[in-house]
Swiss-Prot record:
A motif (Nuclear localization signal) lies at residues 1003-1022. It is found in: Cytoplasm, Cell cortex; Nucleus. Residues 1-101 form the WH1 domain. Residues 626-1046 are annotated as: Disordered. This is Suppressor of Mek1. The EVH1/WH1 domain is necessary for cortical localization.
């Protein structure tokens, strides 16, 4: 190719981004001898000097800009260059030459370039430059072919020998070093195989000794090392020579990579050498594991060898190297190898030589065991637990060697072995754990029972003390067991007292107790003991906590804390962290134990808040440990049977659980309780039992409660008595509560009304008393007592007072019941059930009589209504509201007592009477008044009273009884009866109007009422024992006909 001479300017881009003018000259595209390739060369037009000389690249790095500019970046130096042509024709000619070279890559230049020159001293530089150049992959392949064609390696080694013998070719030896280095960096497997072959390896190592960057005094003599120091020793006959060759080659590659060329190897070449080593190892292991005879022979030779012999040491080292090679294989290949060697007797062979006197032999044995465990621990566990006799002895041998061996390397290896064996949580390892806790752990912790006074093997290094090393690792192993083997280790520690033995080593002075001392404990032994104790506390196990408390195991920890209380060191911080953990986890037993035992010490520590928080937590625990009222009420052992226990009043509420518990007392205890309280009825201490919401009967509430309860007991025992009512309202004490008597029929909704009592708002407006069945009892009592009315007037007067008191007591008790709706509901259901049972017993007998009586009542009521004057009806409708509670009325004095009795009877009425005002409200809601039919007691009628509202059944009963008495007496009594009836109705209106205006009553009237109530109560209780059991009769709980109608 003829040179094209064109006039150009050469530019180079500097670091600042500016183009520097390098000169003007003529450019040619020719073969450059110095480059041994086609290139661009620019010579100065002034002195013909070379301004630019660059090799043409086959890569697409050139760009033509406009018509006279070619720009590119050098691949090696990363310099940005540009040629600016004088005319566009010259630029086009050079551009075409570049494209032709890239497209064809042919011509005299290529064929000459890729032919290596003959090997000689004069051509060493040319060969070196050719190998150093960055060539395309095609050119590299051609050079590699030329290397093998010309036998370049052998020729260079021959030249190296001649130059080295002459002793005058220092520069040429450096050039040969660079040539071999570049051959290796070619990263071609075929070239590496030639260089590392047995024929050329030692001579190549000699050429690589002359590194120009290393001085002659520091030069490494590789040949001397390989020939004299590295000697291949065959301890056992190998099955084939190819295996031996692979072993040699692997060693040499490893030496070349790690010793000869570690500085000059790039990443690609380094990786290629590792790959070559890896595949050689696979080949070696595969050949050995496939030859079972070879392995059996190997194990047999090891067992036959004498103790502490060189032969045994070499054999075990060979086995160790073989296992190390297998560790680097893939999982499948590694698993296959270890399975084969274990099945052929690996562990049995190691057990036979584990106690060898040679340290290297013991280290190699433990290293082989550890290599097996790192692959799969189940291999050794299965071997130890196999039914073959004697296999479990291998575990005992390892533990004994850990305790007694004098080499710290052996101890370290065995500790790792035991840890690896214990790292199991699967069900398959249960057999091994059983073996370990039966035969291994007692031996493992046996050094804790002895006194150790060992000295460090290295002066000034406490960690070199072998005895302390053993103790520390025992602590670490026990800590691991505590964390992962909760069940077995827990009982072992408690039964064998391991904690107490370990905590002896917290004593830095060396004084120990209990048959052994801790010696002069090293600092790390004390920390190990604290860490062991911390692991026990960390489990938060009751057995551990009780063991700590019973054995007083905190004492050694506290002693360490006292000795370091003013020091800011690791021991102090570790113990404070222990206290902080106990506080945060709220381990109550330990908190109480610590504070009660060491409170003075904790209070003296002011530089941390942990101990103060611990004391505060203790106070909270102690406060909560006392039985609260609610808890004590639910406790059936003590508080429920304590007659002096009282409900706690807080926020105007009584403890409901307490009251419910008192009601659950059996009948005999309840009678004894109230009989005792009867004797101390005036006790002022029981005033606190009164709910704050009942403010008008504070002085007599406890007595009323007792009377009410006794009446309840009497009513339960007497079939003729009526059971107590569960839901009442305050009787004239400023309460707007209204009683409604509602008899059960098909349209009644008493169940829903009773459920609504649970709400306080509904209770205040709709307090419902569902005692329909009691009507039969009242009617029966009325019929039985009609004929004896005149004979029982005196008793009736007393009964009036007693009934009045009973009513007020019921009301006071109901004030308490309002604060205990849930408990009252429970008793309501039980009382209703008892009432219904009693009524069902008499239902068949009384049904017909009651139906007749009801019919007669209807006829009599109709006659009374016909005789009723209309002017009286108007007068009653316009009657102003007056207070009848204190016996005041506009009627005559003769009717005054009757009004009081009638008012009391209406208030009592066995808590069944409905006031007219509340009845009117009830009718407004119902809008239609319908006749109610009692399914069990027969039909009843509802008539209009003189005020135009429905008259309650009790009131009709009063009319009926009155008319019956008048029929027995003279006709004049009929008129008096009617007048009394009218007066009673007037008083009823007044009484109900008084209930409406009761909130406006004066304080003096309330005090007067309280005094009057007190007199009635005392009168009742004084006459209670003197009367002929009148309190047990029906008069105490149900009004007689004379009470209902005077």
């Amino acid at each position: 190719m003829e040179p094209l001479r064109k006039r150009v300017k050469v530019y180079q881009l500097d670091n600042s981004g500016k183009w520097d003018d390098k000169g003007t000259g003529h450019v040619s595209c020719i073969y450059v001898d110095a480059l041994c390739a086609m290139g661009l060369i620019v010579r100065s037009e002034s002195d013909n000097s070379v301004i630019l000389q660059t090799r043409l690249s086959a890569e697409d790095i050139y760009q033509k800009q406009q018509d006279s500019l070619i720009v590119w970046t050098e691949p090696d130096s990363q310099l940005d260059l540009a040629l600016s042509f004088q005319d566009s024709l010259g630029c086009q000619d050079i551009w075409e030459n570049i494209l032709q070279y890239q497209n064809q890559r042919t011509g005299s230049c290529d064929s000459v370039d890729l032919d290596l020159p003959p090997v000689s001293i004069n051509n060493l530089q040319t060969i070196n430059e050719l190998l150093e150049a960055s060539l395309p992959m095609l050119d590299k392949d051609k050079i590699i072919n030329s290397i093998f064609k010309e036998d370049l390696v052998r020729s260079l080694l021959d030249l190296f020998d001649e130059i080295e013998k002459s002793g005058e070719g220092g520069v040429h030896l450096f050039q040969i070093f660079n040539i071999f280095k570049n051959l290796i960096l070619f990263n071609d497997t075929s070239i590496l195989e030639v260089i590392l072959s047995e024929d050329y390896l030692v001579r190549v190592m000699g050429a690589l000794e002359y590194d120009p960057e290393i001085s002659e005094n520091n030069r490494i003599k590789h040949r001397e090392f390989l020939n004299q120091q590295v000697v291949f020793k065959q301890v056992i006959k190998f099955p084939s020579k190819s295996l031996i060759g692979t072993i040699h080659q692997t060693f040499r590659i490893q030496y070349l990579k790690d010793v000869v060329l570690p500085r000059v190897l790039d990443d690609v070449t380094f990786s290629s050498l590792n790959s070559l080593i890896y595949f050689n190892n696979i080949d070696i292991v595969s050949q050995i594991q496939n030859d079972s005879d070879f392995l059996e022979n190997l194990f047999s030779e090891i067992q036959k060898s004498e103790k502490n012999s060189e032969e045994r040491k070499d054999l075990i080292l060979f086995l160790q190297d073989l296992c190390n090679l297998a560790k680097g294989l893939q999982i499948q290949s590694k698993s296959t190898f270890f399975t084969v060697v274990v099945s052929l007797g690996l562990f049995k062979t190691l057990s036979a030589i584990l106690d060898d006197e040679n340290v290297q032999t013991r280290v190699s044995c433990t290293e082989i065991v550890l290599s097996t465990l790192l692959h799969d621990p189940e291999i050794l566990r299965s071997y130890l637990c196999s039914p073959t006799s004697g296999n479990s002895k291998f575990l005992v041998q390892l533990i004994n060697l850990f305790i007694t061996d004098k080499d710290i390397g052996v101890k370290n290896q065995i500790v790792e072995i035991i840890k690896t064996l214990l790292e199991a949580d699967s069900y398959d390892s249960s057999d091994f754990f059983r073996l370990f806790y039966d035969k291994g752990i007692d031996l493992l912790v046996s050094p804790l029972n002895e006194v150790y006074k060992g000295e460090p093997t290295i002066p000034g290094d406490p960690s070199s003390n072998l005895d302390s090393f053993v103790l520390y690792n025992i602590m670490e192993l026990v800590i691991y067991c505590i964390k992962h083997h909760c069940y077995r280790i827990k009982h072992f520690i408690v039964e064998e007292g391991i904690a107490k033995k370990i905590l002896r080593y917290t004593n830095p002075t060396g004084s120990g107790g209990g048959g052994g001392g801790g010696g002069n404990s090293e600092r790390y032994l004390i920390l190990g003991s604290i860490r062991f104790f911390r692991s026990m506390v960390n489990m938060k196990d009751d057995l551990y906590n009780q063991h700590i408390i019973q054995e007083n195991l905190f004492e050694p920890i506290i002693e360490v804390f006292k000795s370091n209380i003013s020091r800011y060191n690791l021991l102090n911080s570790a113990i404070i962290e222990l206290f902080q953990y106990i506080y945060k986890e709220n381990i109550r037993d330990l908190i109480v134990y610590l504070v009660e035992r060491y409170r003075e010490l904790f209070e003296s520590v002011t530089y941390t808040d942990v101990l103060k928080q611990l004391i505060l937590k203790y106070e909270q625990i102690k406060d909560s440990s006392f039985e609260s009222p609610e808890t004590s009420c639910n406790n059936n052992d003590s508080s429920s049977n304590d007659i002096d226990s009282k409900p706690i009043i807080g926020n105007n509420k009584i403890n409901h659980n307490y009251q419910r518990t008192q009601r659950e007392i059996d009948e005999e205890e309840e009678e004894a309780y109230f009989n005792r309280d009867d004797d101390s009825e005036d006790s002022d201490d029981e005033d606190e039992l009164i709910p704050i919401s009942i403010n008008n009967n504070n002085n007599n509430n406890n007595n009323n409660k007792q009377i009410c309860t006794n009446n309840e007991n009497n009513m339960e025992k007497n079939d003729d008595n009526i059971e107590k009512d569960n839901e009442n309202t305050n009787n004239g004490n400023g309460s707007s509560h209204i009683k409604i008597v509602d008899y059960e029929d098909e349209d009644d909704e008493d169940d829903e009304i009773n459920k609504s009592v649970e709400s306080d708002d509904i209770v205040e407006k709709h307090e419902i008393i569902d005692k329909n069945e009691k009507k039969d009892e009242i009617m029966k009592e009325n019929n039985d007592s009609d004929n004896d009315d005149n004979d029982n007037n005196d008793n009736d007067n007393d009964n009036d007072n007693n009934s009045d008191i009973e009513n007020k007591n019921h009301l006071n008790n109901n004030g308490n019941n309002e604060n205990n709706e849930n408990n009252d509901d429970v008793q309501d259901k039980s009382n209703n059930k008892n009432n219904s049972d009693k009524i069902n017993e008499d239902e068949k007998i009384e049904k017909q009589d009651e139906m007749k009586e009801n019919l007669e009542m209807e006829e009599i009521d109709e006659k009374v209504k016909e005789k009723q004057p209309k002017d009286i009806k108007k007068e009653n409708q316009s009657q102003p509201d007056e207070t009848v509670f204190n016996g005041k009325s506009n009627n005559s004095n003769n009717n005054n007592n009757n009004n009081n009795n009638n008012s009391n009877n209406q208030e009592i009425g066995d808590n069944r009477k409905t006031t007219p005002k509340r009845k009117l409200d009830y009718e407004k809601n119902e809008s239609v008044v319908s006749k109610k039919i009692d399914k069990s007691n027969g039909p009843t009628s509802i008539d209009k009273d003189i005020n135009g509202c429905d008259e309650s059944p009790n009131k009709k009963l009063n009319n009926n009884n009155s008319n019956n008495n008048n029929n027995n007496n003279n006709n004049n009594n009929n008129n008096n009866n009617n007048n009394n009836n009218n007066n009673n109705n007037n008083n009823n209106n007044n009484n109900n109007n008084q209930n409406d205006e009761n909130e406006l009553s004066s304080a003096s009237e309330e005090e007067e009422e309280q005094l009057e109530n007190g007199k009635h109560i005392k009168k009742f209780k004084r006459g209670k024992k003197d009367s002929n059991n009148s309190s047990n009769n029906s008069n105490n709980s149900s009004p007689t006909p004379s009470e209902l109608h005077v």
